Protein backbone atom coordinates (compact mmCIF):
# COMPACT_ATOMS: atom_id res chain seq x y z
CA UNK A 1 0.00 0.00 0.00
CA UNK A 2 1.35 3.42 -0.97
CA UNK A 3 1.83 6.06 1.70
CA UNK A 4 1.00 9.44 0.19
CA UNK A 5 1.45 12.97 1.51
CA UNK A 6 -1.71 14.97 0.80
CA UNK A 7 -0.64 18.57 0.23
CA UNK A 8 -3.66 20.03 2.01
CA UNK A 9 -4.92 20.75 5.51
CA UNK A 10 -8.54 20.90 4.32
CA UNK A 11 -10.36 18.37 6.52
CA UNK A 12 -13.18 17.98 4.00
CA UNK A 13 -10.76 17.10 1.22
CA UNK A 14 -8.90 14.65 3.45
CA UNK A 15 -12.15 12.82 4.28
CA UNK A 16 -13.08 12.61 0.62
CA UNK A 17 -9.66 11.37 -0.45
CA UNK A 18 -9.72 8.69 2.26
CA UNK A 19 -13.02 7.46 0.80
CA UNK A 20 -11.96 7.77 -2.83
CA UNK A 21 -8.44 6.30 -2.51
CA UNK A 22 -8.87 3.36 -0.12
CA UNK A 23 -5.73 1.69 -1.45
CA UNK A 24 -3.51 4.47 -0.09
CA UNK A 25 -2.47 5.59 3.36
CA UNK A 26 -2.79 9.37 3.42
CA UNK A 27 -0.63 11.71 5.52
CA UNK A 28 -2.05 15.23 5.83
CA UNK A 29 0.02 18.39 5.42
CA UNK A 30 1.34 19.20 8.92
CA UNK A 31 0.31 22.30 10.84
CA UNK A 32 3.91 23.50 11.17
CA UNK A 33 4.52 23.36 7.41
CA UNK A 34 4.23 26.53 5.31
CA UNK A 35 1.23 27.47 3.21
CA UNK A 36 1.69 26.14 -0.31
CA UNK A 37 1.73 28.51 -3.29
CA UNK A 38 -1.35 28.94 -5.48
CA UNK A 39 -0.33 31.66 -7.91
CA UNK A 40 -1.16 29.95 -11.21
CA UNK A 41 -3.79 31.02 -13.71
CA UNK A 42 -5.07 27.47 -14.15
CA UNK A 43 -5.97 24.58 -11.84
CA UNK A 44 -3.15 22.48 -13.31
CA UNK A 45 -0.57 25.18 -12.56
CA UNK A 46 -1.66 25.41 -8.93
CA UNK A 47 -1.79 21.64 -8.41
CA UNK A 48 1.75 21.28 -9.77
CA UNK A 49 3.00 24.22 -7.67
CA UNK A 50 1.58 22.67 -4.52
CA UNK A 51 2.92 19.20 -5.31
CA UNK A 52 6.44 20.49 -5.97
CA UNK A 53 6.38 22.80 -2.96
CA UNK A 54 5.20 20.02 -0.67
CA UNK A 55 7.73 17.57 -2.08
CA UNK A 56 10.65 19.97 -1.54
CA UNK A 57 9.56 20.80 2.01
CA UNK A 58 9.01 17.13 2.92
CA UNK A 59 12.44 16.10 1.61
CA UNK A 60 13.98 18.69 3.96
CA UNK A 61 11.67 18.43 6.97
CA UNK A 62 9.41 15.37 6.70
CA UNK A 63 9.19 13.18 9.77
CA UNK A 64 7.85 10.00 8.21
CA UNK A 65 8.38 7.99 5.08
CA UNK A 66 6.05 8.66 2.15
CA UNK A 67 6.13 7.33 -1.40
CA UNK A 68 4.64 10.31 -3.19
CA UNK A 69 2.92 13.67 -2.86
CA UNK A 70 -0.65 14.27 -4.03
CA UNK A 71 -1.86 17.85 -4.50
CA UNK A 72 -5.35 18.98 -5.44
CA UNK A 73 -6.52 22.22 -6.95
CA UNK A 74 -10.21 22.44 -7.54
CA UNK A 75 -12.98 24.94 -7.79
CA UNK A 76 -16.38 26.01 -8.99
CA UNK A 77 -16.64 27.63 -12.42
CA UNK A 78 -19.87 29.58 -12.98
CA UNK A 79 -20.69 30.53 -16.56
CA UNK A 80 -22.54 33.74 -15.61
CA UNK A 81 -19.44 34.85 -13.69
CA UNK A 82 -17.10 34.26 -16.66
CA UNK A 83 -15.82 31.05 -15.11
CA UNK A 84 -15.38 32.50 -11.63
CA UNK A 85 -14.57 32.00 -8.91
CA UNK A 86 -12.53 29.27 -10.64
CA UNK A 87 -8.96 29.06 -9.39
CA UNK A 88 -9.86 31.63 -6.74
CA UNK A 89 -12.61 29.43 -5.26
CA UNK A 90 -10.76 28.72 -2.01
CA UNK A 91 -10.04 32.42 -1.51
CA UNK A 92 -13.45 33.80 -2.51
CA UNK A 93 -15.15 36.00 0.13
CA UNK A 94 -12.51 35.31 2.77
CA UNK A 95 -13.87 38.17 4.86
CA UNK A 96 -16.82 35.89 5.68
CA UNK A 97 -16.33 33.19 8.27
CA UNK A 98 -18.70 30.43 7.16
CA UNK A 99 -19.27 28.46 3.97
CA UNK A 100 -22.98 29.37 4.16
CA UNK A 101 -22.17 33.10 4.10
CA UNK A 102 -19.73 32.69 1.22
CA UNK A 103 -22.25 30.67 -0.74
CA UNK A 104 -24.89 33.34 -0.18
CA UNK A 105 -22.53 36.02 -1.46
CA UNK A 106 -21.78 33.97 -4.57
CA UNK A 107 -25.47 33.44 -5.28
CA UNK A 108 -26.11 37.16 -4.73
CA UNK A 109 -23.64 37.97 -7.51
CA UNK A 110 -25.84 36.27 -10.10
CA UNK A 111 -28.38 38.44 -11.91
CA UNK A 112 -31.90 37.06 -11.43
CA UNK A 113 -32.20 36.18 -15.11
CA UNK A 114 -28.68 34.72 -15.43
CA UNK A 115 -28.00 31.23 -16.63
CA UNK A 116 -27.07 29.14 -13.60
CA UNK A 117 -24.90 26.56 -15.36
CA UNK A 118 -21.65 25.71 -13.60
CA UNK A 119 -19.12 22.97 -13.18
CA UNK A 120 -16.81 21.69 -10.50
CA UNK A 121 -13.25 21.01 -11.71
CA UNK A 122 -10.51 19.07 -9.93
CA UNK A 123 -6.90 18.65 -11.02
CA UNK A 124 -4.62 16.28 -9.11
CA UNK A 125 -0.84 16.44 -9.34
CA UNK A 126 1.18 13.34 -8.45
CA UNK A 127 4.88 13.66 -7.59
CA UNK A 128 6.93 10.67 -6.40
CA UNK A 129 9.04 11.72 -3.45
CA UNK A 130 12.22 10.48 -5.10
CA UNK A 131 13.07 11.30 -8.71
CA UNK A 132 13.87 7.65 -9.37
CA UNK A 133 10.41 6.46 -8.28
CA UNK A 134 8.46 7.35 -11.42
CA UNK A 135 7.00 10.24 -13.35
CA UNK A 136 5.18 13.33 -12.20
CA UNK A 137 1.82 13.90 -13.84
CA UNK A 138 -1.60 15.46 -13.51
CA UNK A 139 -5.10 14.07 -13.99
CA UNK A 140 -8.41 15.89 -13.91
CA UNK A 141 -12.12 15.42 -13.42
CA UNK A 142 -15.16 17.63 -13.85
CA UNK A 143 -18.89 17.47 -13.22
CA UNK A 144 -21.45 19.67 -14.96
CA UNK A 145 -24.43 21.11 -13.16
CA UNK A 146 -26.07 24.34 -12.08
CA UNK A 147 -26.41 26.56 -9.04
CA UNK A 148 -29.35 26.18 -6.69
CA UNK A 149 -31.33 29.25 -5.65
CA UNK A 150 -30.24 28.85 -2.04
CA UNK A 151 -27.88 26.97 0.28
CA UNK A 152 -29.35 23.44 0.66
CA UNK A 153 -28.08 20.57 2.78
CA UNK A 154 -25.35 19.96 5.32
CA UNK A 155 -23.28 17.22 3.66
CA UNK A 156 -19.87 17.85 2.17
CA UNK A 157 -18.15 21.23 2.40
CA UNK A 158 -17.45 24.39 0.48
CA UNK A 159 -19.79 25.01 -2.42
CA UNK A 160 -21.47 21.58 -2.18
CA UNK A 161 -24.78 22.95 -0.77
CA UNK A 162 -25.35 25.24 -3.77
CA UNK A 163 -24.30 22.88 -6.59
CA UNK A 164 -26.88 20.72 -8.35
CA UNK A 165 -25.10 18.02 -10.40
CA UNK A 166 -26.60 17.44 -13.82
CA UNK A 167 -29.51 15.00 -13.67
CA UNK A 168 -30.20 15.52 -9.95
CA UNK A 169 -32.60 17.80 -8.08
CA UNK A 170 -30.51 17.58 -4.89
CA UNK A 171 -27.33 19.52 -4.22
CA UNK A 172 -24.06 17.86 -3.27
CA UNK A 173 -24.92 19.14 0.20
CA UNK A 174 -28.08 17.02 0.21
CA UNK A 175 -26.85 13.88 -1.56
CA UNK A 176 -25.39 11.04 0.52
CA UNK A 177 -21.61 10.82 0.29
CA UNK A 178 -21.91 7.40 -1.37
CA UNK A 179 -23.80 9.01 -4.27
CA UNK A 180 -21.58 12.07 -4.49
CA UNK A 181 -18.51 9.85 -4.61
CA UNK A 182 -19.75 8.19 -7.80
CA UNK A 183 -19.99 11.39 -9.82
CA UNK A 184 -18.11 14.31 -8.28
CA UNK A 185 -15.19 16.09 -9.92
CA UNK A 186 -12.86 14.73 -7.25
CA UNK A 187 -14.20 11.19 -7.67
CA UNK A 188 -13.55 11.37 -11.41
CA UNK A 189 -10.05 12.75 -10.90
CA UNK A 190 -9.29 9.99 -8.38
CA UNK A 191 -10.55 7.36 -10.82
CA UNK A 192 -8.18 8.77 -13.44
CA UNK A 193 -5.35 8.72 -10.89
CA UNK A 194 -5.99 5.08 -10.00
CA UNK A 195 -6.07 4.17 -13.69
CA UNK A 196 -2.80 6.00 -14.33
CA UNK A 197 -1.15 4.20 -11.42
CA UNK A 198 -2.50 0.86 -12.65
CA UNK A 199 -4.67 0.19 -9.60
Residue ranges and their predicted role:
Residues 2-5, 9-199:
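Anionic-ligand binding patches
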